[in-house]
A protein has these predicted regions:
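Active-site cofactor/cluster-binding pocket
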Residues: 1-256
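Gly-rich Lys/Arg/Thr-decorated short loops/hinges at beta-loop-alpha junctions or inter-strand turns
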Residues: 12, 51-52, 149-151, 218-234, ...
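Thiamine diphosphate
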Residues: 12-100, 268-364, 373-395, 536
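Short glycine-rich or small-residue beta-strand-to-loop segments that form or flank ligand, phosphate
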Residues: 13-20, 169-171, 260-263, 310-313, ...
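A glycine-rich phosphate-binding loop feature that marks nucleotide/adenosyl-phosphate handling sites
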Residues: 49-50, 205, 226-230, 265-269, ...
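Short gly/pro/ser/thr-enriched loop/turn and capping motifs at secondary-structure boundaries
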Residues: 50-54, 113-117, 146, 294-296, ...
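Conserved thiamine diphosphate
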Residues: 79, 134-144, 353-402, 406, ...
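Flexible, low-complexity linker and terminal segments
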Residues: 239-248, 256, 391, 395-615
Length: 615
């Protein structure tokens, strides 16, 4: 053991916590992320857990992981491989070691590497370190036993004490990165406010883990420190995408001066939006947990008709079920925000994994001519702005809007600067005015935008009926006239097509790139990182990442036709590439497609894009 520890200063580091589904790896990772964001580091996280409610203990399929990338400056992805791997049992080491760098430090709980544990993890010998050929530094500590020793006088039973193992590992990682434990203490006291004894037990164990590292130097000769660089002044917090989405909905309702209503049915990975909004009744938020997906959407449409900012949240299977109700919002031309947190499909598919396979469903997955704006969030923190933009678009253009996120984005988190709501654009719904009373009809439109005016129930002189049957363009009465139906289909389509959206920005070597990377939604960080890496290596690469998918930005064709080689990278089998080919004459891109349920790997992107450049 060295007398003094060397502190290595790093610009960035990746830590991966892994263990059984019940080992609390998500909580440990979240707390460490929260500490890092609070002290001023940028972060990007990736929770990775099985779909089982509780997989068999110690099994290879039941391993839960949480990876966080911490940077002194901006970070865009959770990282391809980790600098520190926490493996709380044999199965975690077996399945997660592939994510460790050759220079990584590995922390294991030796108490969970007994023969029965090794057998479950399919090890052939009693020395997994040797069997796997692990050459990295290994901190092998009897964590379970030390936790029981620490809490011996707590009065807790053995099972309850072992639930604190994750906090020992967290304390050890905090020591390794010279983190102050105060933030973790406050987090735990808030989380277990109704169970203070549990909070104090966990806090005691965190300190035990920290002290173990400090007093023994834990088999390593150095610790780390990730510096913080100057950021835009303000208050920062670690925020998940689902929470950011919820906050964006609340902010838009506040800006528009409307109550917020969410009708929803619980579904992975979107349920946290419902949970978060249910906490904010004091802000004028009403949430209804409905009996099914259709009801969730239908109640939201009713709330919209009554004058609320209405939303519904779901995932791909739920969008299938909501499609008829979403079409009701299309034909009645009522504002509605549909949040689709995409997951692996088809059918039940991969509930806890991520894909971008709902794009064409969002664009076209309804009967009839059913135009609907579609926005895709690029990152966890961007979800706030994307949700706000979706609400503004829905309210000002009297249309349902689909907001696409995905499992990777929704479950991940980032360091978020609390915004100044005053700086956000006003939201001005097209309400009827007093002078319209004498000649009001439900589908009276603004001649420039094609948007119908919004008359709320209870306004004298504006009584009207809406419904799912086609309406006369003048009177609002039910109509089956062929010419009228043709007109109404075109009016609804033109209204959406006229919605102004920002131009798509080209990053990197925008003027003279030899390759343009095109993507949308939650792949932004990985595509940007691949572009940066290639440009640092002397290549000329640019990135055009789309947020607005319908309508597309006005400069889309100009951007796509400017470069000799264009590759569309997406987590599906080519939906966005096909859509762009449909919209842009003569556009024939290269494609990079994966549907693994996992985020892109930056090194794999670089290899694939380099191969395209060399053709």
């Amino acid at each position: 053991m060295a007398d003094e520890m060397i502190v290595k200063e790093l610009d960035q580091v990746v830590v991966r916590f892994s263990g059984d589904s019940g080992d609390g790896m998500q909580l440990a990772g979240n707390i460490f992320s929260n500490i890092s964001a609070t002290v001023g580091n940028d972060i990007s996280t990736f929770p990775d857990y099985p779909a089982d409610i509780r997989a068999p203990q110690g099994s290879l399929t039941g391993v839960s992981g949480f990876q966080v990338h911490i940077g002194a400056g901006k970070v865009f992805t959770p990282g391809d491989k980790c600098d520190v791997l926490v493996a709380m049992n044999a199965a975690a080491l077996k399945t997660q070691y592939k994510f460790a760098k050759s220079t990584a430090c590995i922390i294991i709980d030796t108490d969970c590497f007994q023969k029965s544990d090794l057998d479950k993890a399919a090890f052939k010998t009693e020395n997994p370190i040797e069997e796997m050929g692990i050459k990295q530094d290994v901190i092998a500590a009897p964590i379970s036993q030390m936790v029981k020793n620490c809490l011996a006088d707590s009065g807790m039973d053995n099972k309850s004490m072992l639930k604190c193992r994750n906090m020992f590992a967290l304390g050890l990682v905090c020591w390794l990165f010279n983190r102050d434990l105060t933030i973790a203490e406050n987090f735990l006291r808030e989380k277990f406010a109704k169970k203070p004894a549990i909070a104090e037990a966990n806090i005691k164990v965190i300190h035990a883990g920290y002290d173990y590292g400090h007093n023994t130097h834990a088999s390593v000769d150095h610790t780390y420190k990730v510096e913080t660089k100057t950021k835009v002044p303000g208050k920062y917090m670690d925020i998940s995408a689902n929470k950011a989405t919820a906050y964006g909905l609340i902010a838009a309702a506040e800006k528009a001066g409307l109550p917020l209503f969410l009708g929803s049915y619980p579904i992975t990975p979107a349920t946290d939006i419902l949970h978060e909004l249910s906490k904010h009744k004091s802000l004028g938020v009403t949430t209804v947990q409905c009996e099914d997906e259709i009801s969730g959407c239908a109640t939201a449409i009713g709330a919209s008709f009554a004058g609320a900012l209405a939303a519904t949240s779901t995932s791909g299977p739920g969008v299938c079920l909501k499609s008829e109700a979403m079409n009701l919002a299309v034909i009645t031309e009522l504002p509605l925000v549909v949040v689709d947190v995409q997951r692996g499909g088809p059918s039940t598919g991969l509930p806890t994994k991520s894909e971008q396979t709902d794009l064409l469903q969002a664009l076209f997955g309804r009967n009839g001519e059913s135009p609907m704006p579609v926005i895709a969030a690029a990152s966890p923190t961007h979800c706030f702005d994307a949700a706000y933009a979706a609400c503004k678009m829905a309210l000002e253009h009297m249309t349902p809007v689909v907001l696409l996120t995905d499992g990777f984005v929704a479950n991940g988190s980032g360091a978020w600067r609390l915004p100044d709501l005053e700086s956000y654009p006003a939201i001005n719904p097209p309400y009827v005015t007093p002078e319209m009373k004498d000649n009001y009809t439900p589908y009276k439109r603004n001649p420039e935008t094609g948007v119908r005016y919004w008359a709320l129930p209870g306004q004298e002189g504006y009584m009207h009926i809406l419904g799912g049957l086609e309406k006369d363009s003048n009177t609002g009465a039910i109509s089956t006239d062929p010419e009228n139906h043709n007109l109404m289909c075109r009016l609804r389509a033109e209204k959406v097509a006229k919605i102004p959206v920002p131009d798509v920005k080209v990053q990197g070597c925008a003027d003279d790139a030899d390759l343009l990377i095109v993507g949308f939604g939650g792949t932004y960080g990985h595509l940007y990182s691949a572009m940066e890496e290639m440009n640092k290596a002397g290549k000329k690469v640019a990135l055009a990442h789309f947020v607005h998918l319908n309508p597309l930005p006005e400069n889309t064709a100009e951007v796509l036709k400017k470069y000799k080689k264009v590759v569309v990278a997406e987590q599906n089998l080519g939906q966005f590439a096909g859509y762009l080919r449909m919209k842009v004459d003569g556009f024939v891109p290269y494609q990079f497609n994966e549907v693994k349920g996992q985020p892109f790997v930056v090194s794999e992107l670089v290899d694939a894009f380099t191969e395209i450049l060399n053709k």
